[in-house]
Amino acid sequence: MRINPTTSGSGVSTLEKKNLGNITQIIGPVLDIAFPPGKMPNIYNALVVKDRDTVGQQINVTCEVQQLLGNNRVRAVAMSATDGLTRGMEVIDTGAPLSVPVGGTTLGRIFNVLGEPVDNLGPVDTRTTSPIHRSAPAFIQLDTKLSIFETGIKVVDLLAPYRRGGKIGLFGGAGVGKTVLIMELINNIAKAHGGVSVFGGVGERTRGGNDLYMEMKESGVINEQNIAESKVALVYGQMNEPPGARMRVGLTALTMAEYFRDVNEQDVLLFIDNIFRFVQAGSEVSALLGRMPSAVGYQPTLSTEMGTLQERITSTKEGSITSIQAVYVPADDLTDPAPATTFAHLDATTVLSRGLAAKGIYPAVDPLDSTSTMLQPRIVGEEHYETAQRVKQTLQRYKELQDIIAILGLDELSEEDRLTVARARKIERFLSQPFFVAEVFTGSPGKYVGLAETIRGFQLILSGELDGLPEQAFYLVGNIDEATAKAMNLEMESNLKK
């Protein structure tokens, strides 16, 4: 972090104006720039092109140095469109990496990758800024406390609980509900959370970003009357941005979160949607820089880039960052290098299944694929652990029996297996839940279910006390009492029809 010196009108200090270069080549978002001998900028330095195009329109493009090519030339990646740039244009070396505003001034506002506000609410105080490139906290600074982060979502809290100050990944292919789940987590956690939240929209739809902003304003997380009272900062680098912006916008959001953790000593929530787009942008940039592609066409530096980002998302003795990251899974293949590299960094993984989404079970979380390092008896307690294991065993047995059921039918199963199947189907439906953010789609009000209620509900199903209830009574309800009430209503309706 640094307190900025007084800058001249152009926003670049007079001292820094001395180091000027010229564009020698433009290949899409990649620029080659020649500098005077002995005046070469460092890797990651920000370069600024300020000029006018052929029709007199003002150009202001910021780039980041990626390679030193020799012969006093550098190769840089642009953070915005390079339309209108021509060879020979003057380039200013700012002498420092990209820096973005941090602290209370960021709350309630929407920023782009450069830390410029894009919400038409006026300028932001830029006296306190922080460079987006910095090293991860030292090993001795890390905090290792273990505690559960309750989300109010049954399937998550029971089977793959989240760690406070941990890293959580939501894995899923296209259209299975990653963004809806992340919005629900923002709704359930960020609203009740005393600290601040930072949302990084990395290479996703602009519409999704707009929906989230409106939702935040309606719920009061962003306070329109007094913007300083807001609880969230939003950083967007959407699908239409050049790869340089999509590759760096995650670091911009993380830098803002780190300031709240390190300087304000707060507990921070960091939401990133979508971490795969960060990898995808890195792959595009890597190809443009002329690097040899690695497995499945990804960049050879995939592990390094992911590690550099993920190791900064951590909890220290000053404060914590709990991060929830959506991870797109290309072609539903979890062995693809992008999701596979992400897995290694996470404390909990919530895997979304297309099969469950096709059945209409939302959230479509796969109870057998989702994992958490927190699901241990010494952390969650014996009762929670035992219930979770029995639920998984029942669902696993049902999965094993599905082939037999498909060929021979339910009647060929033993009495015990028939009972297991009936309970597994109830469990599967009871793992669904109406979301607050999906009220407009489902027509049913959202439900927050506490952990104790969740455990009680599944224990009742496993014990056999509810074997007499129809399985549709367990679909899209909150706690178990709602399921029994729904069963009574279904019975009354069927009696009336008779």
From Swiss-Prot:
Gene3D superfamilies registered for this protein in UniProt: 2.40.10.170, Bovine Mitochondrial F1-atpase, Atp Synthase Beta Chain, Chain D, domain 3 (1.10.1140.10), P-loop containing nucleotide triphosphate hydrolases (3.40.50.300)
Main location: plastid
GO cellular component terms, A-Z: chloroplast thylakoid membrane; mitochondrion; proton-transporting ATP synthase complex
Enzyme Commission code(s) on record: 7.1.2.2
SUPFAM superfamilies: C-terminal domain of alpha and beta subunits of F1 ATP synthase, N-terminal domain of alpha and beta subunits of F1 ATP synthase, P-loop containing nucleoside triphosphate hydrolases
Keyword Cytoplasm: no
Binding of ATP, residues: G172, G173, A174, G175, V176, G177, K178, T179
Group of enzyme by EC: translocase
This protein's UniProt keywords: ATP synthesis, ATP-binding, CF(1), Chloroplast, Hydrogen ion transport, Ion transport, Membrane, Nucleotide-binding, Plastid, Thylakoid, Translocase, Transport
InterPro entries hit by this protein: AAA+_ATPase, ATP-synt_VA_C, ATP_synth_F1_bsu, ATPase_a/bsu_AS, ATPase_alpha/beta_chains, ATPase_F1/V1/A1_a/bsu_N, ATPase_F1/V1/A1_a/bsu_N_sf, ATPase_F1/V1/A1_a/bsu_nucl-bd
GO BP field: proton motive force-driven mitochondrial ATP synthesis
Catalyzed reactions per annotation: ATP + H2O + 4 H(+)(in) = ADP + phosphate + 5 H(+)(out)
Keyword field contains Lipoprotein: no
Membrane topology: Peripheral membrane protein
Any Pfam family: ATP-synt_ab
Annotated compartments: Plastid, Chloroplast thylakoid membrane
Intrachain S-S bonds: none
Single annotated GO MF: ATP hydrolysis activity
HAMAP family referenced in this protein's UniProt entry, alphabetically: ATP_synth_beta_bact
Function recorded in the entry: Produces ATP from ADP in the presence of a proton gradient across the membrane. The catalytic sites are hosted primarily by the beta subunits.
PANTHER family xref list: ATP SYNTHASE, ATP SYNTHASE SUBUNIT BETA, MITOCHONDRIAL
Quaternary data: F-type ATPases have 2 components, CF(1) - the catalytic core - and CF(0) - the membrane proton channel. CF(1) has five subunits: alpha(3), beta(3), gamma(1), delta(1), epsilon(1). CF(0) has four main subunits: a(1), b(1), b'(1) and c(9-12).
NCBIfam families linked: atpD (TIGR01039)
Stated family: Belongs to the ATPase alpha/beta chains family.
Protein name: ATP synthase subunit beta, chloroplastic
Gene name, Swiss-Prot/TrEMBL: atpB
